[in-house]
Amino acid sequence: PLARCALSLEGAEMSSVKRQTTASSQQDGVSSQPVETHPFEPFLPEGCRLLMLGSFPPSEKRWSMRFYYPNFTNDMWRIFGLCFFNDKLRFVDATAKSFCLDPIKAFLTTCGIGLYDTATAVRRLKNTASDKDLEVVQPTDLQAMVRKLPQLT
């Protein structure tokens, strides 16, 4: 089901991260904002059965770790802790205001969960990670990624 979902994106407009046309990108056809390339490699553990896709990471100044969903105010890792371990602090280092990267990676690997994003290069139209403020310069080749994941369900 998920593989079919990912494959159905071929030729479709990405819904959450849209190619933005703005006044800044209309000046001589080039945006004044720099192009950012994705800072992380896809996290695709052996036996990956589920591929979770976000849009693009926040700017590095907002990171609490060098991995997906790095902003300490983002609840992704708290939700995973609560759902799978009944402990929203399972992956949280409250003292350092960070997430515990090694346990997160071990959990994802054990569960066969891969992570990446729908864009590999973007321009930030504003200083945010909000989908509406991202201009996708290069979308991720999801078909190529899915072909590398034969156990994807």
Give the residues covered by each predicted segment.
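Polybasic, lysine-enriched low-complexity intrinsically disordered terminal tails
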Residues: 15-25
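A polyanion-binding, active-site-adjacent surface
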Residues: 28-153
